[in-house]
Amino acid sequence: MPMFKSNVFKTRQFPTIKRDQDLSDRVGKLMLLAYIGLFFLFLVLPLGALIIKSLQNSDGDYIGLHNFHIYLNEPALFQSFFNSLFIAVVSTIVTVILAFAFAFALTHTRMPFKGFFRLIALIPLLSPSILAAIALVYWFGNQGVLKELLIGYSIYGPIGIIMASVYWTFPHALMILSTSLSLSDARLYEAADVLHTSKFRAFLTITGPGARYGIISTTFVIFTQVFTDFGVPKVIGGNYNVLATDIYKEVVGMQNFQMGAVISLVLLLPAILAFFVDQYSRKRQVALLSSRSVVFDPKKYRTLDMAMLAFCGLITVIILMMIGMAQFGALVKFWPYNLSLTLKHYSFEVAGLGWESFYNSIRLAFYTAVFGTVIIFVGSYIVEKLRTQEQLRGILQFFALLPMAVPGLVLGLSYIFYFNAANNPLNFIYATMAIMVINTVVHFYTVSHLTAVTALKQMDKEFEAVSLSLKVPVFKMFWRVTLPVCLPTILDISIYLFVNAMTTVSGVIFLYTYNTTLASVSSIHLDEQGNVAAAAAMAMLIVYVSVFVRVLHAIITRGVLWKTQAWRHRAQET
């Protein structure tokens, strides 16, 4: 009899579970379609408008590839492509070499002060790329402190662009390479020691090959960042034209939107190629991991440790000199004739380029962090946790990765063509803070999405099945289980979006208005007007806020997560 009751109970419960599952699937499908629709609306269609604009003349008539023919036959414009390529290749090589050595020191040596070196090395992440260019002007400009070190060469041009690009991309390369090198298998090094293999040979046969996919990924990430950057060449490029500045000149200076669209597509192609190669290398990197791998703990080797200590110390000094000079330049009265300190440059007397733009940046960063975190995490949850609609999930996953291949300058210009169209029902968001928030969320969507998906993969998929069998609503499961477990990741995503929204330049350079000017944009325009000290002051304000928010994030994370993540500590103790 007890068994009979149990069977009856199961039979009666099954239809209820089935209905709940069907309802959950329908809701999931609707959300998938909604997210795919949003990507079409705010990514695919704007890029389509950009392509259409490149095939039209100034009157809007279709002229095929005539604009591309003009571009290819214009030596000055075509030369910019090779200039961009040269800058990107040289900057990438230098950055990858320096970052690899630094990451090797952090992960494969016993040198002291690793935490300090890592902290200082990440400082450029908290500043706009233009800050490096401004600092170099003070160091090596026409009235620079170390101008003689350039032995007659000018900092305004490829030398300055490369130096500034290496500075601001260094921490990006360091994070990727540190992760790659930290995955080294200690068993391989133990075998090398047993075979009396030299340190150099072990490096060539174990360390290098083990990190090759990380190096490939870093190479294409840095190449794309430098190739598509606008801020650095705008400030310190001088007469050395690159694709990013050409787009700006064509659109803003000459109002030639068609040629701007053509150059944008030229800028987009290498970025897309780098994106697909990077995705391939990331997948291969995952395939190298083994469940039997042993964490590598480097042995003490005094000669190597001291050499790496000297190298990391030099890099750290250079980073501090750059940020320190930018701050000093913002405080002196009149460089280089009156070096007494003052705060007058923080008054920003130029209308529209002062404190209003700083507050606008904080608003943009706040809105991007709040709305972007919610949208991205929910989208990642749908992709990772929905059990059905594999085809739609695959489409959404592709769209979620696509923004990484689209340079900010290209995305911003495409928004002009699409949302400024009179027949677009969404025309009302053009020239508002809303369009800049949307643009920024889309621009930085991919990294946040991948971060969220990684966290969600750590959760057992049976959580959803158990909640369904207990008739617990999906939203309740999401609120009470998923969010607390993933709270560290959610906070990381929010701070990532906030800092990047504060420092972004290229993504919003075409979208701001007089009332929505941002601090990063104001810094560029102040430099254009010759007010370098005020430009440095504005850039440093961005650094202040980014540092403050980072510290606040660390404090909140430490306090809140101690309560919500107590189960992790108990699990580790057992």
Where in this protein do the model-derived segments appear?
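Juxtamembrane inter-helical linkers in multi-pass membrane proteins
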Residues: S198, Q285-K300, W335-E349, P473
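Transmembrane alpha-helical segments of polytopic membrane transport and secretion proteins
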Residues: M1-A34, D278-L314, T388-R393, A554-T574
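Membrane-water interface segments at the C-terminal ends of transmembrane alpha-helices
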Residues: V27-S58, E74-S182, G210-G231, V262-D278, ...
